[in-house]
Amino acid sequence: MGTDNQTWVSEFILLGLSSDWDTRVSLFVLFLVMYVVTVLGNCLIVLLIRLDSRLHTPMYFFLTNLSLVDVSYATSVVPQLLAHFLAEHKAIPFQSCAAQLFFSLALGGIEFVLLAVMAYDRYVAVCDALRYSAIMHGGLCARLAITSWVSGFISSPVQTAITFQLPMCRNKFIDHISCELLAVVRLACVDTSSNEVTIMVSSIVLLMTPFCLVLLSYIQIISTILKIQSREGRKKAFHTCASHLTVVALCYGVAIFTYIQPHSSPSVLQEKLFSVFYAILTPMLNPMIYSLRNKEVKGAWQKLLWKFSGLTSKLAT
């Protein structure tokens, strides 16, 4: 293959979801509202946990980390997507595309590991409740959170580097909403088997391994719940895990379907829809899931609103 055919591109063109102007404007309004709700919801969860001493527990410490990851992931994708909805020239510089891929891979990896850590926390809370405080002490929680963040940022630069060293042969049109891994790899004009193997290995390490740990944790949790004699006790134990289990199903389900088998990957349209779901819907839904299904969080919201209304009344008088 000639050198001329392997010319590096300086920018990419993201084809996005639609070329129709009216559709793009409608999507801009919809995604802008969803992004604002995502940022506000996750930031309010972090603020609520910070302000309410009753929520200063390992579970909510990890939830704080999850909210930070969610809002960061959405921010790595959505602002650029919104700008391109209204732009005629949907270009993204090479460096910006690489940075977007780096952060999306890193934050995705962090989330998968963090969800496994949260499953372990729920396992200890249900299966070893008497020793919960002794096991899940502050030092261990901090180390588990740091491990989650480090694991994502270790694998991401490797995956990003081997992806963007592929010759693109002047092919700069990315048929996606962002610089997503599989979409960028498809631009290469050389054999990408080694990249697909790397994607598979990375998926096993950062996706399937945490997922298996989650499954093992919940097998033990369910086994313990079934041994509880009282119906009220079983109900309380189940509600302890319900919110996390819902989030696990949302996050792992989409990622496994997209990445675990590159050779039989979904269609381009499905990939775009999965990316929208993962980058916008999931971060927006997570705070709602934890708020609506958790009595402690709902109680903290009521307490905060009561304080806020009291402060407003004082200022008004």
Curated annotation (Swiss-Prot):
Instruction: Name the InterPro entries for this protein.
Output: GPCR_Rhodpsn, GPCR_Rhodpsn_7TM, Olfact_rcpt
Any one Pfam family match given in the protein's UniProt record, by short name: 7tm_4
Q: A Gene Ontology CC term for this entry? A: plasma membrane
- Name the cystine pairs: 97-189
Similarity comment text for this entry: Belongs to the G-protein coupled receptor 1 family.
Identify the PANTHER family for this entry.
OLFACTORY RECEPTOR
Q: What is this protein called?
A: Olfactory receptor 2F1
In its UniProt entry, the species of origin is given as Homo sapiens (Human)
